[in-house]
Amino acid sequence: MKKTAFILLLFIALTLTTSPLVNGSEKSEEINEKDLRKKSELQRNALSNLRQIYYYNEKAITENKESDDQFLENTLLFKGFFTGHPWYNDLLVDLGSKDATNKYKGKKVDLYGAYYGYQCAGGTPNKTACMYGGVTLHDNNRLTEEKKVPINLWIDGKQTTVPIDKVKTSKKEVTVQELDLQARHYLHGKFGLYNSDSFGGKVQRGLIVFHSSEGSTVSYDLFDAQGQYPDTLLRIYRDNKTINSENLHIDLYLYTT
């Protein structure tokens, strides 16, 4: 009996000293790594387009914009959004539903999102770019100082330090898209997240989890892509999901197998 109790206590001690913890909760509560999609499962052009979206392409970032214009009832059209752009003048934002759009229609808003032109339907043909979500109200939503969002990163179960300044926001209520775009930009720059194996892309699977102060979470499988072009790859942001930035942190899990 004493031997059994000693073995049990030893096992518990080893578990506590070897399992990475975040805010007192083991990382295993968030994911089942076996359910993550593999990079090799992506459609032919998806990987290169994900690389373009999250690392190379410009983002639509502005403050204090207002529009009553629409193409469909679930959209807002910002005319003259782009200045000096070689192709686009206007930005058409798809918010997924009439109710979601009415929340921002005619109000001062801030925009932060990834836009695309190919397969963009609405506005002036060939002069309008499209974007899913990325909208927050401007008034009473500004922090007194920019917040740097802490990031916990595990690579194959081993915790790795991430500089504190890689994901930032000046908003109290921020879209998950704004945070996700910054986080994936860092991951690709540091680890070649969306590079092919032949170009040094060692990461094969991954998950990003956003934890709010209220205890709610939002997560994305980093390789669970819809289709292979931006008009479908970016659709994950159509719900314009937002999260409170107070006590917010991000957990990242990368796997090389």
From Swiss-Prot:
Residues 1-27 form the signal peptide. GO terms for molecular function: metal ion binding; toxin activity. PROSITE patterns: STAPH_STREP_TOXIN_1, STAPH_STREP_TOXIN_2. GO terms for cellular component: extracellular region. It is found in: Secreted. Transmembrane segments: none annotated. Binds 1 zinc ion per subunit. The zinc ion is necessary for the toxin interaction with MHC class II. Disulfide bonds join 120-130. Gene3D superfamilies: 2.40.50.110, 3.10.20.120. Pfam families: Stap_Strp_tox_C (PF02876), Stap_Strp_toxin (PF01123). Belongs to the staphylococcal/streptococcal toxin family. Interacts with host MHC class II molecules composed of alpha/HLA-DRA and beta/HLA-DRB1 chains. Interacts with host T-cell receptor beta variable TRBV7-9. Staphylococcal enterotoxin that activates the host immune system by binding as unprocessed molecules to major histocompatibility (MHC) complex class II and T-cell receptor (TCR) molecules. In turn, this ternary complex activates a large number of T-lymphocytes initiating a systemic release of pro-inflammatory cytokines. Also causes the intoxication staphylococcal food poisoning syndrome. This is Enterotoxin type E. The gene is entE.
